[in-house]
């Protein structure tokens, strides 16, 4: 039994924040699943870097270029294709876990972050296009996003609610989820599977924001502990919300709790152990998310121990000290959400620009081949006899 399998024995699911076409086609995904990975989340930054530096998507981009597809639509088509392939591969896990794991999660265009109506419409559209049961669409936990969570849960859609940096925001999301789940069970449960959703709580970003404030106040002994304390407090809040008569009625009808999903678990501070957040947040009924590097580190030298019973007291003690220092964690959480939402929007724009540049590179290669008869990428050669790109 390896370390991921030990986490499974303790009731924690293990997902990977990585996806690119060669990863899906080469057998690397198969190897990670064999190690114990149970879900995937697409990473926009990695997607852009792959398009820029690798040939994974050249053939697919060229096919879209020759069809006259604009760059934003090319992005969408590439992601949908990857998600479909990954979801098909992960479907066995989805079935064996009875819909708890085996999901592939993809980002929603951040331009919709403050628009509940169009968020709902776009998620429904994506779900229909992808047409896979084990797909989660990521909805940011803005006020509009939380409103959309209620509507989409009512419709039976599984979601990954993102950009959560505080326990209070998790609680608001959880209440919307329960409200939607109750309606779903009253109206749709006879013909649709009950949705399974998670909330991505960003870990390392919190310490990155709080640690400099602690250092300024001479409280270095508190550094690197705030994110873990908040995550542990969130687990306690989750246990409280998903208990009692109201929830028990929902659970008896097949409702599942809104599991916390630990994201950004790679420490930003090199002084912290590379497996620090993974090891300190081992808990049943949660999902922990690995980067490739953190996964390799944890499989090599990670510790698997869980002391959940001590978490409430430890978390309360630390957070009380932080509050006494005048550090406003709610304000920091709000700022982090806004910063990361802006970063997500910029990342999507960067992908569109990157695809446009790649399109130009492929068109120039086509033109050079036509003039000089030089060798070009095989993806282009397959199209040369019959097609010419539509220039936009």
Where are these regions (language model features)?
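Active-site-adjacent beta->alpha loops and helix N-cap segments on the catalytic face
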Residues: 23, 115-120, 139-153, 166-178
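Catalytic alpha/beta core domains of metabolic enzymes, predominantly
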Residues: 157-293
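Flexible, acidic glycine-rich loops studded with aromatic residues
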Residues: 254-365
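Active-site beta->alpha loop and helix N-cap motifs at the rims of alpha/beta catalytic domains
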Residues: 46-47, 53-148
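Conserved, mostly hydrophobic/aromatic
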Residues: 43, 106, 137, 152, ...
């Amino acid at each position: 039994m390896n370390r991921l399998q030990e986490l499974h024995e303790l009731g924690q699911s293990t997902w990977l924040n990585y996806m690119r076409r060669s990863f899906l086609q080469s057998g690397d995904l198969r190897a990670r699943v064999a190690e114990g990975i149970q879900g995937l989340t697409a990473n926009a930054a990695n997607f852009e870097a792959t398009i820029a530096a690798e040939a994974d998507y050249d053939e697919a981009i060229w096919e879209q270029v020759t069809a006259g597809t604009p760059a934003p639509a090319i992005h969408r088509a590439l992601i949908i294709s990857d998600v479909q392939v990954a979801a098909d591969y992960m479907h066995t896990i989805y079935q064996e876990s009875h819909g708890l794991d085996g999901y592939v999660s993809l980002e929603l265009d951040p331009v919709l972050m403050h628009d509940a109506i169009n968020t709902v419409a776009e998620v429904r559209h994506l779900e229909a296009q992808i047409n896979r049961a084990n797909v989660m669409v990521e909805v940011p936990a803005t006020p509009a996003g939380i409103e959309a969570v209620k509507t989409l849960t009512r419709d039976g859609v599984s979601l990954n609610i993102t950009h959560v940096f505080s326990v209070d925001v998790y609680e608001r999301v959880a209440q919307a989820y329960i409200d939607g789940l109750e309606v779903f069970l009253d109206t749709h449960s006879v013909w649709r599977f009950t949705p399974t959703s998670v909330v991505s709580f960003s870990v390392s970003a919190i310490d990155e924001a709080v640690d400099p404030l602690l250092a300024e106040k001479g409280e270095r002994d508190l550094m690197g502990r705030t994110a873990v304390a908040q995550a542990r407090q969130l687990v306690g809040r989750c246990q409280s919300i998903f208990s009692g008569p109201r929830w028990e009625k929902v659970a008896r009808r097949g409702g599942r709790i809104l599991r916390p999903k630990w994201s950004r678990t790679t420490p930003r501070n090199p002084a912290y152990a590379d497996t620090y957040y993974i090891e300190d947040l081992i808990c049943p009924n949660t999902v922990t998310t690995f980067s490739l590097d953190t996964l390799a580190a944890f499989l090599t030298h990670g510790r698997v121990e869980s002391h959940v019973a001590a978490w409430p007291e430890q978390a309360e003690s630390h957070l009380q000290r932080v509050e006494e220092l005048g550090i406003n964690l709610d304000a920091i959480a709000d700022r982090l959400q806004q910063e990361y939402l802006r970063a997500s929007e910029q990342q999507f724009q960067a992908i569109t620009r990157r695809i446009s540049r790649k399109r130009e590179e492929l068109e120039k290669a086509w033109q050079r081949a036509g003039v000089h008869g030089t060798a070009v990428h095989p993806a282009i050669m397959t199209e040369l006899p019959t097609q010419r790109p539509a220039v936009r």
